[in-house]
Swiss-Prot record:
Cofactor(s) required, per the database record: [4Fe-4S] cluster
Domain Radical SAM core: 36-253
EC numbers: 4.1.3.-
Gene from which the chain derives: ahbC
PROSITE patterns, alphabetized: RADICAL_SAM
Class in the EC hierarchy, top level: lyase
Protein name (record): Fe-coproporphyrin III synthase
Function: Involved in siroheme-dependent heme b biosynthesis. Catalyzes the conversion of didecarboxysiroheme into Fe-coproporphyrin III by oxidative loss of two acetic acid side chains.
Length: 399
């Protein structure tokens, strides 16, 4: 996760994170990416059921009842363990988390245990009554997925009217005083809608958006050919940077982030070296605090059936199940080769990759997204094919 607005628009300084000792339990949510202890933010895909059928869904969700989901009591036991382990945030996701009737109860329980509770939703089922309940239980944030304006989004979601329904859900949350934001997965079919999405942020006073680079997992594994080319990715990031700057210059300081491609960090830094060298030095310090991709370290995932994964895109590999062992025990068990490798990946990347092994940004990006390397090359430790930096930019010939 790269905080575009924080870094490019200068809304965060290194001292902001240092003031809290970079302790994940003390840091405000907008500074968690700079924590030193990297206690995992945990995505709990609490259900596989969903009222939509998105073409890029990593969970391959459907609108049917699935067996073997963690019960309410099992969910509370998971939350107990996460809270005692020091996980600062639990992100309720799916499928569609609002289809579970016990979502408010579980979110309230997480808050009681001192965790921040957030949800990732398609927004279409959030009526005013549900928004009131979510506000009452102290939900910190509602992230609504929109992958384009109206027709583009509805095509992705597999339902006519999904865009308008999602906006209604977002408005209901706003009216109840819940912080909201958008989630947008970039690909060839919707990249042209990025300017309109920025317009929507301003028109609807939406304070946050995360732009996700495409990850080849679940139904998204069938969309490899729909991913942007490397040059198109650079152009998309340039556009996001430009529109973010313009928003801030107009007095609307929206929080803009990019997710799942950590070469965005060095790319932004190199851009600032030309535009504002003094700020570039501060940004490099912040990127060093961020430490790059955190799958298996600062981000984890628990499936609806209790399986533990390195993140929500690693569903094909489980480290264990919370029905058999606590998450905290599974997460710290280095007898699993992949878990141990993800926590100390640089030697493995240097042994197996070409570009990454020679890259001067490896300490900043941490090898980018391993699951994408595996999907394309069949090797977890190979180069991430979505890295758009040139050989000159990574210092390939200097190594």
């Amino acid at each position: 996760m790269i905080g575009i607005s924080k870094l490019y628009c200068g809304t965060v300084e290194p001292s902001d994170a240092l003031r809290y000792g970079r302790d994940s339990k003390k840091l405000p949510s907008h500074l968690l990416q700079f924590s030193k202890d990297k206690k995992p933010v945990v995505v709990w895909n609490m259900t596989r059921r969903c009222n939509l059928k998105c073409v890029h869904c990593y969970a391959q969700a459907k609108d049917i009842e699935f067996e073997n989901e963690l019960s309410t009591e099992e969910g509370k036991a998971l939350i107990d363990d996460l809270a005692s382990f020091g996980s600062p945030v639990i992100l309720f996701s799916g499928g569609e988390p609002t289809m579970r009737k016990d979502l408010p109860e579980l979110a309230a329980y997480a808050r009681e245990k001192g965790m921040r509770a957030v949800i990732s939703t398609n927004g279409t089922l959030i009526d005013r009554e549900m928004a009131k309940k979510l506000k009452e239980v102290g939900l910190s944030y509602v992230g609504v997925s929109l992958d384009g304006i109206r027709e583009t989004n509805d095509k992705f979601r597999g339902m006519k009217g999904a865009f308008d329904a999602a906006l209604r859900g977002l408005h209901n949350c706003q009216e109840e005083g819940i912080k909201v934001g958008l989630r947008f997965t970039i690909n060839k079919q919707n990249v042209r809608d990025i300017p309109a999405i920025f317009d929507l942020l301003e028109e609807e006073k939406i304070p946050r958006i995360c732009f996700y680079h495409l990850v080849y997992a679940g139904r998204g594994s069938k969309m490899v050919n729909e991913d942007l080319s490397l040059e198109e990715s650079r152009q998309a990031v340039d556009l996001i940077l430009e529109r973010t700057r313009k928003l801030h210059e107009k007095g609307f300081p929206a929080e803009v982030l990019t997710v799942d491609n950590h070469c965005d960090g060095p790319y932004l830094y190199m851009k600032l070296l030309k535009e504002n060298p003094e700020r570039a030095a501060e940004v490099f310090e912040l990127l060093s605090m961020n430490q790059g991709n955190s799958s298996g370290i600062g981000i984890g995932c628990v499936s609806w059936d209790g399986a533990v994964h390195a993140d929500q895109f690693w569903r094909h590999y489980s480290f264990g199940n919370v029905r058999e062992r606590p998450f905290s025990e599974i997460w710290t068990d280095l007898s699993d080769e992949l878990m141990a490798g993800l926590k100390n990946r640089k030697p493995l990347i240097k042994a197996h990759a070409d570009r990454c092994a020679r890259c001067k940004w490896l300490d900043v990006c941490n090898g980018n997204f391993r699951v994408r390397a595996e999907a394309v090359y069949g090797n977890v430790w190979a180069d991430d094919p979505a890295c758009y930096l040139t050989k000159e930019e990574i210092g390939y010939y200097e190594a």
